[in-house]
Every structure is written in C-alpha cells, then in structure tokens.
Amino acid sequence: IGTVDYPYAGVFEGNGHRILNLTIDNDAAGNIGLFGVVTGGAKIRNVVLDASSYIYAKAWAAGIVGTTKNDGLVEITGCGNEADITVTGANAGGILGVNDQQTAMVYITNCYNTGAITAQRESAAISGWLGNRAKVVNTYNTGIVAATGLDGNLTFARGTNCEYINCYELDGSQVTAVTSNQVTDGELCYLLNGKQSDDVVFFQTLGEDSHPVLDKTHKVVYFDGTKYVNELLPDAIESTTDTTGATVTGIWSLSGMKQNTLQKGINVVKMSDGTVRKVLVK
C-alpha cells in the first residue's frame, strides 16, 4: 500500500486485526512493508503482522511501514511486528524502515517488535533511520537485531535527538533494559501500562503469551504486591465500615495516587484500625 509516486496519506484503522502468512521475497526491491511508502498525514493504527509472515528485500523495509517521505506528521499507533525482516542493504526495522531524508515527523506509540531484524547499516529493532524529530512512546522490542555498522548500542531505533518515553528492549541499553523473565512474567506488560491496571493498552495471558500483546481478548496484568497475576482475590468492602467497626480513612490507586472514592480496578484502602486492603471494583 503506497508507492514513491503515490505515497499513502490516509488513515488506516486495522481494528486490532492480525495479518497472517504474508510473504514478500524480493531482494531487488525497496520500500517494502505492509505499507510501502507513506507521507505526511498518514495514520496507521491497530494492526499486527504475525510471526507466520516474512519479508526479504533489498533495503528500506519493515513489517508495518517501509518508508516515510516528504513533510508532515506520520503516526503509527497500536501496531506490532512479529515477522522476521531481512534486507541485503540498509534501513530495516520492525515498525519503520526509514524516514527518507528525515523530512517527516514520525510518532510511534504503543507498538512492539518481536521479529528478528537482519540488515546492514542504519537498521534497528523498532525503526531504521528515524531522523531527528521522532518520538517513540510506550513501545518495546524483544527481537534479535543483527545489523552491521551499528552506531554503538543503537539496537532499538536509529536517529538523532529522538525522544523515547517509557520504552523497553530485551537486554539492550538504548532504552530501559528488561530481562526475559520480566517479559514473560507480566512485569513488562505492567510497566507498559504505566504501572496500573485500570486503563490498559497491552494485555498478556500469563502462562500462554510469551510477551505483551495488543489484543483485548487477552487478560489484564495486575500486581498483587509480590507478583504479577491475571486475577486478584481482594477483600470486599460493602460499606465504609466493616464488621469490626473500622472505617475507611484513605483510598489510593496502585500507583499511589490518592482518591476520594473507590474507582474501577484495584484500589488500596486504609482502615481506621491500621489495616490496608486491596479492593477490586469491576
């Protein structure tokens, strides 16, 4: 979707769909991805390229967008790449291959890559060359990057003066590093959701999902104070006074924000007798 002559500039809403068994095998071609070339104004949302897919190209390739070009803002939101990406030349990534001539402003939000990226220079897990005005938010990588000519430890994304907010990579150093245990046990999912379980973007059915996903049919991750779980069995409070006569003296969210009333999700409740309870409101 999108070519050099006719780059995509619309709004694509994937509605959380997953693309399976997409194979692109052309080592003579560039500008390769689910979207080949996009330009300012393009918004790519909520689609995942499944691990059953594979891309092999010459250069400027990624699972979601091969190339951005021209001025304007390009937004890639809620997208995941699980496919392996191999290019014989430069500029490959899981989400974006290259911001050509670094003219576009690129925002990547709530995205992830778990595929292996094999390429030459200016390649990395989330994006090849991003330019100097990009922002990447709430995004993670667990895929292996095998790229020659890496600039130091820039395995997450390539670019200068780019802004990375709440981003994570497996055993990396460009953004916050996480271990394989943190990926599988739910901690990474909880971190991506801002250390809260009320208004979440990432989901993970523990014991089944090897990494956080964007699929709402999977389970929410909670922190019970000692470990990450999908279900909580909190104490119930029917009123502001319990059977011992203790009253509620304070209510906080799990992140520590004081609240006036119980909110949907998990609440930390302090009683007048000094006890503290977790209360789940559905």
Locate each region found by the language model.
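C-terminal outer-membrane/trafficking sorting elements
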Residues: 234-282
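Surface-exposed repetitive/solenoidal architectures
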Residues: 1-233
